[in-house]
Amino acid sequence: MFKGSIPALVTPFTAAGSVDADSFVAHVEWQIKEGSHGLVPVGTTGESPTLSHDEHKKVVELCVEASARRVPVIAGAGSNNTIEAIELAQHAEKAGADAILVVTPYYNKPTQKGLFAHFAAIAESVKLPIVIYNIPGRSVVDMSVETMAALAKAHPTIVGVKDATGRIERVSEQRMACGKAFVQLSGEDATALGFNAHGGVGCISVTANVAPRLCAEFQEATLAGNYAKALELQDKLMPLHKAIFLEPGVCGAKYALNRLGRMSFTVRSPLLSALEPATASAIDAALRHAGLMN
């Protein structure tokens, strides 16, 4: 159910800084039209840390309504507060999301037993499939393969992981520990090719915000075993993967989307709605390299 190119959607804002519902709905529609295989609203790229709870919930509702069951919606529902994560998960279920993406608790650095308890409590509170988001670079805690396997065994609704550890061997380790049916989605665009070769089935992608058709075609090629085609597309996309992350990814993605005429380049503080000139030039060059801009 969850595979292929799944953009971690940006959340457009108006010039005044409020959520731009019309632009968000248009972005969802474009993503589906261009071939994206799923959608993730209110993840890190959706600026969830600086959305209010009401805004967070509204964006999930907008995404579910706009997508109209054409592709699965995996709603962000993470928090370092278990009670808060349960509330967001229950809202996503009520709103009609197909699954939830739950990040490992950040800042408070729980033990592996604490991680197990956190995810178990969420799994017991909703019937939705849960995708673990393991990103030690941001959360400063790394869910071990053993903890992940124990969760998958104890709670069948914990169906997969978005892996942003940067350790490609983890895909094989998790496949052996959690089983072949456990859904593994890359959390890093640049390494998605190798990730899928190790047994992954897709990518929750930042770049797909900007190049949805290319990212969808890339994923389809890898999943079909057509690595010659996948490499050709990887070569087109790699400069964009790299350039977008020269500064915080959402800033790079929104700048690129603005250059393509799709939305304003407005982010919330402490992020800045401006890029260093060298970053902007690199993104422009990458857009041209990918054939997205003249």
Swiss-Prot record:
Stored Pfam families: DHDPS
Active-site residues, as the UniProt record annotates them: Y133, K162
Gene Ontology process terms (BP): diaminopimelate biosynthetic process; lysine biosynthetic process via diaminopimelate
Segments traversing the membrane: none
Recorded name of the encoding gene: dapA
Function noted in UniProt: Catalyzes the condensation of (S)-aspartate-beta-semialdehyde [(S)-ASA] and pyruvate to 4-hydroxy-tetrahydrodipicolinate (HTPA).
An example molecular function term from Gene Ontology annotations: 4-hydroxy-tetrahydrodipicolinate synthase activity
Enzyme class: lyase
Species name: Rhizobium meliloti (strain 1021) (Ensifer meliloti)
Entry protein name: 4-hydroxy-tetrahydrodipicolinate synthase
Main location: cytoplasm
Known partners and oligomeric status: Homotetramer; dimer of dimers.
Binding site for pyruvate: T45, I204
Reaction equations catalysed: L-aspartate 4-semialdehyde + pyruvate = (2S,4S)-4-hydroxy-2,3,4,5-tetrahydrodipicolinate + H2O + H(+)
Record-marked site positions (Part of a proton relay during catalysis): T44, Y107
